[in-house]
Amino acid sequence: MPKVNPTLGGKLSPDIDEAAQAIARRQRWKIVPEGAWAANLLGLSTQVPAKIIYLTDGPNNEVLIGRRSIHFKHARPKAMAGLEGKFALVVQALRYLGKEGVSTREIQTLRTALSPAEKRRLVKDARFGVDWIYEVAKRIAEKTA
């Protein structure tokens, strides 16, 4: 049932991420927001990408939700291994931003967005990935004065 804006009295567009998660649950797919969408979900970018893409262990698929479409892009099992929850979101966002695109602002935004337990898990899991992402993960987890 669509949500209604009490002030405007009209129906709200469905939340794209909630819709994607519901589709993935129903299909028993594992999904991870890709690139620009991951950065947007974490507040690292205000830009909403024109194409909403999720990596999935399921087949390539496109689903229309209102006037928006969600693209599910099949990823190799190796590419999906270990990518779950906030860790997956952070890794995808960092890959999108690139090594040179991660500044103090992004580090601070992620420090705020992640709980202490999520920061510890990020550092632990990032050890096995790309070196620069591991270094960024350590900076995110550092205690600040």
Give residue ranges: language-model regions.
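Short beta-edge/loop segments at beta->alpha junctions of small alpha/beta modules
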Residues: 1-23
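Short gly/ser-rich loop at a beta-strand->alpha-helix junction or flexible surface loop bordering the NTP-binding
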Residues: 2-3, 24-66
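Generic recognition of short, well-ordered alpha-helical interface segments
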Residues: 15, 33, 37, 85-89
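Short, charge-rich amphipathic segments
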Residues: 16-28, 102-108
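Positively charged, aromatic-accented nucleic-acid-binding surfaces
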Residues: 21-23, 34-37, 96, 100-101
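Short amphipathic alpha-helical patches
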Residues: 42-50, 61-68, 113-121, 133-137
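Short, aliphatic-rich beta-strand segments
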Residues: 69-73
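Hydrophobic alpha-helical interaction segments
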Residues: 74-145
